[in-house]
UniProtKB/Swiss-Prot annotation:
PANTHER family: 40S RIBOSOMAL PROTEIN S3A. This is Small ribosomal subunit protein eS1. It comes from Monosiga brevicollis. Keywords: Cytoplasm, Ribonucleoprotein, Ribosomal protein. One of its GO terms (cellular component) is cytosolic small ribosomal subunit. Signal peptide: none annotated. It is found in: Cytoplasm. GO terms for molecular function: structural constituent of ribosome.
Length: 259
């Protein structure tokens, strides 16, 4: 049996122990701020590497996308809607975000599917009045009629086409507004209720929802519009009207009334 060196039992090792450095010592934290049409504005904090040389920390934050429950943003009990927010501008230590998408949770979608019913899905690309191009997906299920004794409630092919056409028509009509107003329609689910009401004459539907919203294209970035969206129109603050001394300018001190 050949006897060799056991490296694990060797007393001496080349070099010392590697110094463990906590990576978070090189990071700083920023507040993530939601638009003003949500009840809860401060939604969390996010870390980013500190500014080093020509690499700014703000550049690492712009474009980040955060996904959170709509229930956390609006203090609502309906927890099956998820909202995506994208960072568009940095102001101090705050990340100003804008709407980037919406979807239903997987468990909610799975719970909707049942036997003996037809699934109706439709999608359409729309353009809002302020230049956002959105792709909207809707979903619905046929409902058993009140005077029917049949076990199933399947819709015929012609009825399915008519239902999809009506869905597309309503989604296009509801999107003829700006993005802020459209998001306010998404949150309570009024578009799904409108589809369910208008499709009643074709075939009764139930469990109608806007399943997903994607932002395909955004208009040219405008800081003033983003500040207005966050309730800070034009960047006006409470310090408006104060006389601010320029750097290097002499300011005469006020006389002291007492020593």
């Amino acid at each position: 049996m050949a006897v060799g060196k056991n490296k694990k039992l060797m007393k001496g090792k080349k070099g010392g122990k590697k110094k463990v450095v906590d990576v978070f010592t090189k990071k700083e934290w920023y507040d993530v701020k939601a638009p003003s049409y949500f009840k809860k504005r401060q939604v969390g904090k996010t870390p980013v590497n500190r500014t080093a040389g020509t690499k700014l920390s703000a550049d690492g934050l712009r474009g980040r996308v955060y996904e959170m429950s709509l229930a956390d943003l609006n203090d609502d009990e309906s927890t099956f809607r998820k909202v995506k927010l994208q960072v568009e501008e940095i102001q101090g230590t705050e990340c100003l975000t804008n709407f980037h998408g919406m979807s239903l949770t997987t468990d909610k979608l799975r719970s909707l599917v049942k036997k003996w019913r037809s699934l109706i899905e439709a999608f359409v690309d729309v353009k809002t009045n302020d230049g956002y191009v959105l792709r909207i997906f809707s979903i619905g299920f046929t409902k058993k009629q009140a005077n029917s004794d049949r076990k199933t409630c399947y819709a015929q092919s012609a009825q399915k086409r008519a239902l999809r056409a009506k869905m597309v028509e309503i989604m296009q009509r509801e999107a003829t507004c700006d993005l802020k107003e459209f998001v306010s329609k998404l949150m309570p689910g009024t578009i799904g209720q409108e589809i369910q009401k208008k499709c009643q004459s074709i075939f009764p539907l139930q469990d109608v929802y806007i399943r997903k919203v994607k932002v395909l294209k955004k208009p040219r970035f405008d800081v003033s519009k983003l500040l207005e969206l966050h309730g800070e129109a034009g960047g006006v603050t409470a310090d408006k009207g104060k006389t601010v001394a320029k750097s290097g300018e002499f300011v005469e001190p006020k006389p002291q009334t007492s020593v």
